[in-house]
């Protein structure tokens, strides 16, 4: 039941996020789009902040299952959305169930493979992507046409998203909780509070995306954001055993980087996409994010379990430092791809 509820909840989140971006890019002036895309990532960071602060209290004094009820508040917003979102002309459309199925098979199998390094999921993932490629070439009414991926800028942006976003929860969900508990010998509750300033900074930076966009081009903003992400990972890798304040500062830089990157990266991805195809483009963009994040959690957790020691040393600190160096190399690869 919990898994089913989580599937429904995640589906709603993915749809809401994608539809918001589609609304912004279709109905708002181009000069305002970065501002409102920034509000989206700011809201996400703020939600993470509130989740960290309230989940412990709810789990302790009520029940962790009560957290599922929080999302019911969103039902109250439906009348407002119905009244304020402009109506659009509806057309008959074919839902490519088979194409979506192949994508789901590929994505889930790839995540399982990265988490376990078992050959069967790898084979299933390869079969899934092969069948998807065959499907879009062999049939007409598919979720996307092959020509869609001939747009070099869009494909490059998707690669950057896949690579860089895989590091997003590697730091906050794997390294920081583990380092706080096993390196600094403090509680997981402490780890949650150390993450709070990072999400707060991310929310502020996201809300200021419009102002940042007026002073920096999309390219410069993206490179600055990627630089912040890389610096955060390298800083933590070098000083992880020194003080927990290092983790706080790193998380602030890290969250600021992702918040700054979101709006200009979306804008770059769809810059050359025809207006009638932006919905599909944004859908695949968010699909890539939703694939990259669990992939990152899977390989980061696997590295932690393997007790990896890249630069010598022993103990838990050396393991988490090595994980961070791997994440830093991956983030650097994302910068190279973008360049």
Model-derived regions, located:
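Cytoplasmic-side transmembrane-helix entry/capping segments in multi-pass membrane proteins
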Residues: 33-43, 91-101, 147-153, 219-226
């Amino acid at each position: 039941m919990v898994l089913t509820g989580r599937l429904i909840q995640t589906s709603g989140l993915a749809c809401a996020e994608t539809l918001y971006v589609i609304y912004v890019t279709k109905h708002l002036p181009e000069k305002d789009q970065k501002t409102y895309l920034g509000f989206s990532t700011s809201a996400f960071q703020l939600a993470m902040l509130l989740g960290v602060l309230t989940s412990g209290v709810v789990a302790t004094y009520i029940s962790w299952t009560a957290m599922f009820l929080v999302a019911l508040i969103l039902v109250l917003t439906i009348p407002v959305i119905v009244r304020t979102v402009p109506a659009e002309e509806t057309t008959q459309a074919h839902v490519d169930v088979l194409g979506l199925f192949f994508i789901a098979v590929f994505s889930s199998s790839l995540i399982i493979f990265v988490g376990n390094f078992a050959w069967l999921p790898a084979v299933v993932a390869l079969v899934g992507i092969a069948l998807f490629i065959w499907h879009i070439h062999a049939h007409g009414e598919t979720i996307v046409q092959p020509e869609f991926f001939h747009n070099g800028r869009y494909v490059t942006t998707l690669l950057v998203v896949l690579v860089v976003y895989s590091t997003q929860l590697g730091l906050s969900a794997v390294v920081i909780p583990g380092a706080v508990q096993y390196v600094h010998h403090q509680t997981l509750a402490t780890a949650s509070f150390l993450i709070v300033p990072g999400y707060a900074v991310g929310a502020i930076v996201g809300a200021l995306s419009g102002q940042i966009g007026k002073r920096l081009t999309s390219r410069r903003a993206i490179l600055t954001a990627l630089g912040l992400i890389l610096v955060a990972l390298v800083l933590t890798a070098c000083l992880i055993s020194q003080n927990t304040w290092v983790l706080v500062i790193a998380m602030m830089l890290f969250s600021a980087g992702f918040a700054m990157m979101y709006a200009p990266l979306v804008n770059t991805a769809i810059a050359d996409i025809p207006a009638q195809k932006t919905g599909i483009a944004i859908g695949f963009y968010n699909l890539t994010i939703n694939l990259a994040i669990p992939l990152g959690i899977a390989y980061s957790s696997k590295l932690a379990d393997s007790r990896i020691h890249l630069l010598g040393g022993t103990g838990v600190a050396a393991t988490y430092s090595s994980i961070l160096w791997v994440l830093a190399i991956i983030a650097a690869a994302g910068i190279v791809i973008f360049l």
